[in-house]
Structure formats: C-alpha cells, structure tokens
Amino acid sequence: MTSNFDTSDKNAQKGGDFVPRLAMINDIAGFGRCSTTVSLPVISVMKVQVCPVPTSVLSNHLGFPLCHFDDYTSHMRDYIKVWNELGLTFDGLYCGFLGNEEQINIVREFVEMFRPPLFLLDPVMGDHGRAYSSITETHVQKMKELLPLADIITPNITEACLLTGTPWKDGEWTMQELSGLCLKLATLCQTDSTLSLSEHFHDASNSVIDTS
C-alpha cells in the first residue's frame, strides 16, 4: 500500500511560515502539573510542532510517596524506528524524565540517528535535596554521559549536586557557590553548553551562566 503522506520538511510550512518541529522525549504524569502535560501546550502555543516520545505513563510525579508507573522502555525503539523509516526530521530535541538507564541509551541513539540541531536536556532526577525513588547511582552516572551531547542543560540544584557529587546544602546558595556548581557542570559537558539552574534563587535573571 502506497501512502500519499509527505514527511519532508515542507510539511512544516503553513502559509509560507516555517514551523519548527521538536521531538519531546518525556513522561506523561496524570497529576502534578509537570512533564509532557505541561510542556506540550506551552511549546505548541509558541508555534512549534511538538512530537512526543513517551518514556512512561505515571499516575502522578515521583515526588509523592506512591505512584503507578507504566514503563514504556520496551516500545521506545520501535516507536522511534518508524519515525526514521518515515524520513522525519527534527529541528530540536527536548528530553525530560528518563525512568531507567536503558532509556538514557535510547536517547543517545536518537541523537545519533536524527542529529537534531538543538538538544535541550533536562536531567530530571530529584528535588529539594533528594533523588526520586527510581533514581540509582548508576542512573546518575549514565546521565552524565548525555551531558556532552546537549546544547542546553537545565538541572535544578538538586540534580546539579547529584551530577557533580556536590553535597546538598539546605537554605540559600550564594552566587559564588552556584557559579562553582555551574563550572563543575561545564567540565562534565565538555562543550559550549548553556547551563540553567532554577532552584533557590532570589533573582531568576542571574540563574543562567553561559560557558561558551
């Protein structure tokens, strides 16, 4: 059966205006105002075509003591393979929560397969000084391997501490401490990535340090 569906980049045109196409690798959480359910409408209203790759379906985010967790790992490669066979291309990749180490491997494969011009990595692993229940030390080490592939990383301070082996500190962090944390992350990135920390700031305008 022959399809008349055209998957070329001209499908990203509407009335002559270019519509960027973003692949989003992230979970779907039913409760908690996070992940794909929040990101998709926000990015879509910015006139970007969002193409989700679900990593898991959760009853709620992992900050709660209980959670129904439906792992999608076994489907992800087949899902992505079809995109590749259709000849789809993407102007960017946004990666959020990854439920296990194998999903990190799949993200690496996605980057190698599609070569997105822009890769934003949100290394979702914890909050308020604690790793989420599903996050192991092996997971943290594997996440470090993704950092050099990303153009932008957006860890909160908890995740930055996990990635750099920095002890968690309760209370406010000084700009000097945060700058030091960003420099540690820049060393892990090994590229001209832009770093953004989003937790425990009085002045959010100071939360981005460009390491280029």
Task: Annotate each PLM feature.
Residues 2-133:
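Conserved N-terminal subdomain of the carbohydrate kinase-like
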